[in-house]
Design a protein with these regions (language model features):
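Alpha/beta-hydrolase superfamily serine-hydrolase fold, recognizing
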Residues: 27-40, 46-58, 65-74, 96-354
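Bacterial N-terminal signal peptides
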Residues: 11-20
Protein backbone atom coordinates (compact mmCIF):
# COMPACT_ATOMS: atom_id res chain seq x y z
CA UNK A 1 0.00 0.00 0.00
CA UNK A 2 1.23 3.51 -0.78
CA UNK A 3 0.81 6.95 0.64
CA UNK A 4 -1.58 9.68 -0.49
CA UNK A 5 -1.53 13.39 0.48
CA UNK A 6 -4.73 15.41 0.60
CA UNK A 7 -3.92 17.05 -2.71
CA UNK A 8 -1.30 15.89 -5.05
CA UNK A 9 -0.40 15.84 -8.71
CA UNK A 10 0.32 12.72 -10.64
CA UNK A 11 1.29 11.97 -14.21
CA UNK A 12 -0.46 9.00 -15.78
CA UNK A 13 0.75 7.14 -18.81
CA UNK A 14 -2.00 4.69 -19.78
CA UNK A 15 0.17 2.24 -21.66
CA UNK A 16 2.31 -0.78 -21.01
CA UNK A 17 5.43 1.44 -20.76
CA UNK A 18 7.04 2.11 -17.38
CA UNK A 19 6.12 5.32 -15.56
CA UNK A 20 8.74 8.04 -15.29
CA UNK A 21 8.42 8.34 -11.54
CA UNK A 22 11.48 10.47 -10.89
CA UNK A 23 10.56 13.04 -13.51
CA UNK A 24 6.98 13.25 -12.34
CA UNK A 25 8.03 13.81 -8.74
CA UNK A 26 10.42 16.62 -9.70
CA UNK A 27 7.89 18.63 -11.71
CA UNK A 28 5.97 21.45 -9.99
CA UNK A 29 2.35 20.75 -9.14
CA UNK A 30 0.00 21.70 -11.97
CA UNK A 31 -2.72 24.25 -11.34
CA UNK A 32 -5.31 22.48 -13.48
CA UNK A 33 -6.06 19.20 -15.23
CA UNK A 34 -4.69 18.62 -18.72
CA UNK A 35 -4.47 15.77 -21.22
CA UNK A 36 -2.80 14.97 -24.53
CA UNK A 37 -3.27 11.89 -26.69
CA UNK A 38 -0.92 10.01 -29.00
CA UNK A 39 -2.13 8.66 -32.36
CA UNK A 40 -2.28 5.14 -30.88
CA UNK A 41 -4.62 6.29 -28.12
CA UNK A 42 -2.05 6.52 -25.34
CA UNK A 43 -3.15 9.24 -22.92
CA UNK A 44 -0.80 11.58 -21.04
CA UNK A 45 -2.85 13.03 -18.22
CA UNK A 46 -1.96 15.49 -15.49
CA UNK A 47 -4.50 15.44 -12.70
CA UNK A 48 -5.07 17.11 -9.37
CA UNK A 49 -6.78 14.55 -7.14
CA UNK A 50 -8.24 15.87 -3.87
CA UNK A 51 -8.93 13.75 -0.84
CA UNK A 52 -12.34 12.12 -1.48
CA UNK A 53 -15.12 13.46 0.71
CA UNK A 54 -17.22 10.36 0.03
CA UNK A 55 -15.45 8.05 2.49
CA UNK A 56 -15.33 7.90 6.27
CA UNK A 57 -13.13 10.28 8.24
CA UNK A 58 -11.17 7.23 9.39
CA UNK A 59 -10.52 6.26 5.79
CA UNK A 60 -9.48 9.81 4.93
CA UNK A 61 -6.98 9.83 7.80
CA UNK A 62 -5.65 6.45 6.74
CA UNK A 63 -5.18 7.50 3.12
CA UNK A 64 -3.39 10.65 4.27
CA UNK A 65 -1.06 8.63 6.48
CA UNK A 66 -0.05 6.32 3.64
CA UNK A 67 2.19 9.04 2.20
CA UNK A 68 4.81 8.51 4.86
CA UNK A 69 5.60 4.80 4.60
CA UNK A 70 5.77 4.07 0.88
CA UNK A 71 8.16 1.16 0.18
CA UNK A 72 10.36 1.45 -2.88
CA UNK A 73 11.38 -1.33 -5.24
CA UNK A 74 12.43 -4.39 -3.28
CA UNK A 75 13.79 -7.86 -3.79
CA UNK A 76 11.64 -10.90 -3.16
CA UNK A 77 13.48 -11.58 0.10
CA UNK A 78 12.85 -8.00 1.25
CA UNK A 79 9.18 -8.23 0.27
CA UNK A 80 8.73 -11.46 2.20
CA UNK A 81 10.48 -10.08 5.27
CA UNK A 82 8.40 -6.90 5.24
CA UNK A 83 5.20 -8.84 4.68
CA UNK A 84 5.97 -11.21 7.54
CA UNK A 85 6.33 -8.28 9.95
CA UNK A 86 3.04 -6.55 9.20
CA UNK A 87 1.18 -9.84 8.76
CA UNK A 88 2.16 -10.88 12.29
CA UNK A 89 1.02 -7.52 13.66
CA UNK A 90 -2.27 -7.51 11.76
CA UNK A 91 -2.97 -11.16 12.57
CA UNK A 92 -2.63 -10.37 16.27
CA UNK A 93 -5.00 -7.42 15.85
CA UNK A 94 -7.48 -9.63 13.98
CA UNK A 95 -7.50 -12.20 16.79
CA UNK A 96 -8.02 -9.46 19.37
CA UNK A 97 -10.95 -7.89 17.51
CA UNK A 98 -12.46 -11.18 16.32
CA UNK A 99 -11.77 -13.87 18.95
CA UNK A 100 -11.48 -17.40 17.58
CA UNK A 101 -9.60 -20.62 18.21
CA UNK A 102 -6.69 -21.35 15.87
CA UNK A 103 -5.10 -24.78 15.55
CA UNK A 104 -2.19 -25.62 13.29
CA UNK A 105 -2.80 -28.73 11.23
CA UNK A 106 -1.84 -30.67 8.13
CA UNK A 107 -4.62 -31.39 5.65
CA UNK A 108 -3.91 -33.71 2.71
CA UNK A 109 -0.22 -33.08 3.25
CA UNK A 110 -0.67 -29.30 3.13
CA UNK A 111 -0.04 -27.02 6.09
CA UNK A 112 -3.26 -25.41 7.27
CA UNK A 113 -4.71 -23.40 10.14
CA UNK A 114 -8.08 -24.55 11.45
CA UNK A 115 -9.92 -21.43 12.62
CA UNK A 116 -12.99 -22.10 14.73
CA UNK A 117 -15.43 -19.56 16.19
CA UNK A 118 -15.70 -19.56 19.97
CA UNK A 119 -19.43 -20.20 19.72
CA UNK A 120 -20.61 -22.07 16.62
CA UNK A 121 -24.34 -22.70 16.05
CA UNK A 122 -25.29 -26.34 15.63
CA UNK A 123 -26.41 -25.68 12.04
CA UNK A 124 -22.90 -24.52 11.15
CA UNK A 125 -21.08 -27.63 12.29
CA UNK A 126 -21.69 -29.13 8.87
CA UNK A 127 -20.46 -26.03 7.02
CA UNK A 128 -16.84 -25.05 6.37
CA UNK A 129 -14.93 -22.40 4.45
CA UNK A 130 -11.55 -22.67 2.74
CA UNK A 131 -9.41 -19.52 2.78
CA UNK A 132 -6.67 -19.01 0.20
CA UNK A 133 -4.52 -16.10 1.36
CA UNK A 134 -3.23 -13.16 -0.63
CA UNK A 135 0.37 -12.12 -1.13
CA UNK A 136 1.11 -11.97 -4.84
CA UNK A 137 1.60 -15.77 -4.97
CA UNK A 138 5.08 -15.32 -3.50
CA UNK A 139 4.37 -14.45 0.14
CA UNK A 140 1.67 -14.86 2.79
CA UNK A 141 -0.07 -11.56 3.40
CA UNK A 142 -3.31 -12.71 4.91
CA UNK A 143 -3.79 -16.28 6.12
CA UNK A 144 -5.14 -15.23 9.54
CA UNK A 145 -5.97 -11.65 8.59
CA UNK A 146 -8.60 -13.00 6.18
CA UNK A 147 -9.71 -16.18 7.92
CA UNK A 148 -10.09 -14.95 11.50
CA UNK A 149 -12.70 -12.20 10.93
CA UNK A 150 -14.79 -14.37 8.61
CA UNK A 151 -14.77 -17.32 11.02
CA UNK A 152 -15.88 -15.01 13.82
CA UNK A 153 -18.56 -13.16 11.86
CA UNK A 154 -19.95 -16.07 9.85
CA UNK A 155 -19.70 -18.40 12.87
CA UNK A 156 -18.18 -21.07 10.61
CA UNK A 157 -14.99 -23.09 10.66
CA UNK A 158 -12.35 -21.76 8.26
CA UNK A 159 -9.49 -23.86 6.92
CA UNK A 160 -6.71 -21.48 5.90
CA UNK A 161 -4.37 -23.06 3.37
CA UNK A 162 -0.62 -22.37 3.24
CA UNK A 163 -0.23 -23.32 -0.39
CA UNK A 164 3.19 -23.53 -2.02
CA UNK A 165 4.59 -20.21 -3.16
CA UNK A 166 6.23 -18.96 -6.34
CA UNK A 167 8.85 -18.64 -7.71
CA UNK A 168 10.03 -21.82 -6.02
CA UNK A 169 6.72 -23.49 -6.93
CA UNK A 170 5.02 -21.85 -9.92
CA UNK A 171 1.55 -22.66 -11.28
CA UNK A 172 -0.14 -25.09 -10.81
CA UNK A 173 1.40 -25.93 -7.41
CA UNK A 174 -0.88 -23.62 -5.41
CA UNK A 175 -3.96 -24.86 -7.27
CA UNK A 176 -2.96 -28.47 -6.64
CA UNK A 177 -2.56 -27.81 -2.90
CA UNK A 178 -5.95 -26.14 -2.64
CA UNK A 179 -7.63 -28.92 -4.62
CA UNK A 180 -6.03 -31.51 -2.34
CA UNK A 181 -7.45 -29.76 0.74
CA UNK A 182 -10.88 -29.50 -0.89
CA UNK A 183 -10.89 -33.20 -1.77
CA UNK A 184 -9.98 -34.04 1.82
CA UNK A 185 -12.85 -31.93 3.15
CA UNK A 186 -15.24 -33.70 0.78
CA UNK A 187 -14.74 -36.77 2.96
CA UNK A 188 -16.46 -34.95 5.84
CA UNK A 189 -18.62 -32.27 4.21
CA UNK A 190 -21.12 -32.11 1.39
CA UNK A 191 -19.78 -29.99 -1.49
CA UNK A 192 -22.61 -27.49 -1.18
CA UNK A 193 -21.58 -27.01 2.47
CA UNK A 194 -18.08 -25.86 1.50
CA UNK A 195 -17.19 -22.31 0.51
CA UNK A 196 -13.90 -21.07 -0.93
CA UNK A 197 -12.65 -17.50 -0.64
CA UNK A 198 -9.58 -15.33 -0.80
CA UNK A 199 -8.19 -11.88 -1.40
CA UNK A 200 -5.96 -10.82 -4.31
CA UNK A 201 -3.79 -13.85 -5.17
CA UNK A 202 -6.13 -15.94 -3.03
CA UNK A 203 -9.14 -14.61 -4.93
CA UNK A 204 -7.50 -15.57 -8.20
CA UNK A 205 -6.78 -19.01 -6.79
CA UNK A 206 -10.39 -19.41 -5.66
CA UNK A 207 -11.59 -19.03 -9.25
CA UNK A 208 -8.76 -21.19 -10.60
CA UNK A 209 -9.59 -23.97 -8.15
CA UNK A 210 -13.25 -23.92 -9.17
CA UNK A 211 -12.26 -24.31 -12.83
CA UNK A 212 -9.89 -27.15 -11.95
CA UNK A 213 -12.54 -28.94 -9.90
CA UNK A 214 -14.91 -28.73 -12.85
CA UNK A 215 -12.24 -30.14 -15.18
CA UNK A 216 -11.67 -33.02 -12.76
CA UNK A 217 -15.37 -33.81 -12.64
CA UNK A 218 -15.54 -33.08 -8.92
CA UNK A 219 -18.60 -31.43 -7.36
CA UNK A 220 -18.23 -27.67 -7.05
CA UNK A 221 -18.41 -25.85 -3.70
CA UNK A 222 -21.49 -24.05 -2.49
CA UNK A 223 -20.09 -20.54 -2.85
CA UNK A 224 -17.06 -18.55 -3.94
CA UNK A 225 -15.73 -15.33 -2.39
CA UNK A 226 -13.53 -13.56 -4.95
CA UNK A 227 -12.23 -10.45 -3.26
CA UNK A 228 -10.18 -8.31 -5.68
CA UNK A 229 -8.98 -10.61 -8.43
CA UNK A 230 -7.95 -10.94 -12.02
CA UNK A 231 -9.01 -13.80 -14.27
CA UNK A 232 -6.83 -13.16 -17.31
CA UNK A 233 -3.03 -13.27 -17.14
CA UNK A 234 -2.72 -12.50 -20.85
CA UNK A 235 -3.94 -8.90 -20.69
CA UNK A 236 -3.70 -5.96 -18.30
CA UNK A 237 -6.91 -4.33 -17.08
CA UNK A 238 -7.27 -0.55 -17.29
CA UNK A 239 -7.15 -0.01 -13.53
CA UNK A 240 -3.77 -1.72 -13.34
CA UNK A 241 -2.48 0.93 -15.72
CA UNK A 242 -4.26 3.71 -13.89
CA UNK A 243 -3.23 2.94 -10.33
CA UNK A 244 0.28 1.52 -10.75
CA UNK A 245 1.72 4.88 -9.79
CA UNK A 246 4.23 5.83 -7.16
CA UNK A 247 2.46 7.51 -4.26
CA UNK A 248 -1.06 6.43 -5.21
CA UNK A 249 -2.75 3.91 -2.89
CA UNK A 250 -3.52 0.77 -4.82
CA UNK A 251 -0.06 0.39 -6.34
CA UNK A 252 1.74 -2.89 -5.80
CA UNK A 253 5.48 -2.71 -6.43
CA UNK A 254 6.90 -5.65 -8.39
CA UNK A 255 10.08 -7.14 -7.02
CA UNK A 256 13.43 -6.31 -8.59
CA UNK A 257 14.03 -9.95 -9.48
CA UNK A 258 11.07 -10.73 -11.71
CA UNK A 259 7.54 -9.55 -12.19
CA UNK A 260 5.34 -11.42 -9.73
CA UNK A 261 3.04 -12.56 -12.56
CA UNK A 262 5.99 -14.22 -14.28
CA UNK A 263 7.02 -15.89 -11.05
CA UNK A 264 3.61 -17.48 -10.68
CA UNK A 265 2.80 -18.21 -14.33
CA UNK A 266 6.11 -19.89 -15.09
CA UNK A 267 6.01 -21.60 -18.49
CA UNK A 268 2.22 -21.99 -18.61
CA UNK A 269 0.28 -20.50 -21.52
CA UNK A 270 -1.26 -17.30 -20.16
CA UNK A 271 -4.59 -18.24 -21.72
CA UNK A 272 -4.69 -21.63 -20.02
CA UNK A 273 -8.28 -21.88 -18.74
CA UNK A 274 -7.25 -22.83 -15.20
CA UNK A 275 -4.59 -20.13 -14.93
CA UNK A 276 -6.89 -17.56 -16.56
CA UNK A 277 -10.50 -18.54 -15.76
CA UNK A 278 -11.82 -15.92 -18.17
CA UNK A 279 -11.05 -18.47 -20.92
CA UNK A 280 -12.72 -21.38 -19.11
CA UNK A 281 -16.24 -22.76 -19.37
CA UNK A 282 -17.80 -20.89 -16.46
CA UNK A 283 -21.28 -22.38 -16.78
CA UNK A 284 -22.57 -23.89 -13.56
CA UNK A 285 -20.21 -21.90 -11.32
CA UNK A 286 -21.28 -21.57 -7.67
CA UNK A 287 -22.90 -18.38 -6.39
CA UNK A 288 -20.08 -15.85 -6.23
CA UNK A 289 -19.44 -12.60 -4.37
CA UNK A 290 -16.87 -10.25 -5.88
CA UNK A 291 -15.62 -7.28 -3.85
CA UNK A 292 -13.38 -4.44 -5.02
CA UNK A 293 -13.01 -0.66 -4.68
CA UNK A 294 -12.65 2.30 -6.98
CA UNK A 295 -8.90 2.74 -6.34
CA UNK A 296 -8.13 -0.98 -6.44
CA UNK A 297 -5.56 -1.85 -9.08
CA UNK A 298 -7.67 -4.94 -9.80
CA UNK A 299 -10.96 -3.05 -10.13
CA UNK A 300 -11.11 -3.58 -13.88
CA UNK A 301 -10.15 -7.23 -13.69
CA UNK A 302 -12.67 -7.95 -10.94
CA UNK A 303 -15.52 -6.37 -12.87
CA UNK A 304 -14.48 -8.12 -16.10
CA UNK A 305 -14.72 -11.49 -14.37
CA UNK A 306 -18.05 -10.57 -12.78
CA UNK A 307 -19.48 -9.85 -16.22
CA UNK A 308 -18.09 -13.14 -17.53
CA UNK A 309 -19.85 -14.99 -14.73
CA UNK A 310 -23.11 -13.23 -15.53
CA UNK A 311 -22.78 -14.00 -19.25
CA UNK A 312 -22.43 -17.67 -18.33
CA UNK A 313 -25.73 -17.57 -16.45
CA UNK A 314 -24.32 -17.62 -12.94
CA UNK A 315 -25.42 -15.98 -9.72
CA UNK A 316 -22.73 -13.35 -9.24
CA UNK A 317 -22.80 -10.32 -6.96
CA UNK A 318 -20.40 -7.38 -7.28
CA UNK A 319 -19.79 -4.89 -4.46
CA UNK A 320 -17.59 -1.87 -5.22
CA UNK A 321 -16.44 0.34 -2.35
CA UNK A 322 -15.65 4.01 -2.79
CA UNK A 323 -12.16 5.54 -3.08
CA UNK A 324 -10.21 2.83 -1.25
CA UNK A 325 -7.17 0.87 -2.44
CA UNK A 326 -6.46 -2.78 -3.03
CA UNK A 327 -7.53 -5.14 -0.21
CA UNK A 328 -8.44 -2.28 2.11
CA UNK A 329 -10.36 -4.73 4.33
CA UNK A 330 -7.04 -5.80 5.83
CA UNK A 331 -7.17 -2.51 7.77
CA UNK A 332 -9.56 -3.11 10.65
CA UNK A 333 -9.86 0.50 11.87
CA UNK A 334 -12.01 1.51 8.90
CA UNK A 335 -15.82 1.52 9.05
CA UNK A 336 -15.69 0.38 5.43
CA UNK A 337 -13.75 -2.70 6.52
CA UNK A 338 -16.44 -3.63 9.02
CA UNK A 339 -19.02 -3.27 6.26
CA UNK A 340 -16.97 -5.31 3.79
CA UNK A 341 -16.31 -8.15 6.24
CA UNK A 342 -19.96 -8.16 7.27
CA UNK A 343 -21.02 -8.39 3.63
CA UNK A 344 -18.67 -11.32 3.06
CA UNK A 345 -19.82 -13.19 6.17
CA UNK A 346 -23.50 -12.64 5.35
CA UNK A 347 -22.96 -13.96 1.83
CA UNK A 348 -21.45 -17.20 3.09
CA UNK A 349 -24.21 -17.65 5.65
CA UNK A 350 -26.83 -17.20 2.92
CA UNK A 351 -25.20 -19.36 0.24
CA UNK A 352 -23.13 -22.14 1.84
CA UNK A 353 -25.28 -25.18 2.47
CA UNK A 354 -28.52 -23.39 1.61
Amino acid sequence: MHRLPKKFSLVLFLALACIAIAAAQSNPAPSQDSATFDPDGTAHITRVVPMPATISTEAQSWLESLEHTTPGPETLAERRARTDVWRAQDSAEARKLYPVNVEEATTAGVRTDIITPLAMPAENKDRVLINLHGGGFNSDSGSLIEGVPIANLAKMKVVSVYYRLAPENPFPAAVDDAVAVYKELLKSYKPQNIGIFGTSAGAILSAEVAVKLKQLGLPLPGALGIFSALADFSRVGDSRQLFTLNGFPGQMQPTDEKHLDDQYVGKTDRKDPVLSPLYADLSGFPPSLLVTSTRDILLSDTTIFHRALLRSGNNSQLVVFEALPHAFWYHFQLPETKEALGTMAKFFDEKVGR
